[in-house]
Amino acid sequence: IVASTPALTAIANGAKRIQALDRGGKPLTPSRYVAPPGRHSMSAFLEKCTGCGLCVARCPAKVLRPSSNEFGWLHPLHPVMDFDTSYCRYNCTRCTEVCPTGALQPLTIEEKHIFIIGHAQVEPANCIGCGLCASRCPRKAITLRPRDNRSAGQSRLVANVDNSACIGCGACEYICPATPMKAIVVNGVI
C-alpha cells in the first residue's frame, strides 16, 4: 500500500485535470493575483509592502500567504490571497489594522464591505449548477441562470456573476466543488 503524500496527490490531481480537458473542460486560472484589501493601488502596494508577514500571520481566515513569484521577482513575500485554502471574511479588517508600512490602509467594516480586491469569473463548461457559490456570496453577486446546451437539447443552471456587486472576497472560489477544475475563480484588480 502506498501512503498518500503531497507529491502523489499533485500527480493524481494533474491526471484528473488532463482527463477533464479531454472531456471538454476548461482550465480557469487567475489572470491577475489578488492582493489584500486596503491598498490605494497595486503599484503603491508593491512599492510600500516590505513582505514583513504581519498581515499573513494575523489573518484569522488564513487566506493570506507569502507570494513566491505572483507579483514578480522584485516583490517576494508580498501577501497574496489563496482561495484554495480559505476566503477573505466579509467583516474582517485585521490585515489593514496591522500593516506597519501603509501598504494597506486601515479600513472600517463599512469600507471593507465595498472595497473591491477582485472580480469573480465563471467558466460555464465547468459549472455543475450546485448553487454553493451563490449561497456563500456575502454580497449576493452570484445567481444561477439557465444555460442552453443545444447539442444535448436541454438547459442547465450555471453561475452568473454581477461584477457591479462582486468585491472579490473569494468565498465562491473557495466553496466551489467542481473538480478537477473550479468553475469560478477570482481575478485581482490593478
Task: Give a label for each model feature.
Residues 1-190:
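Non-ligating segments of multi-cofactor redox enzymes
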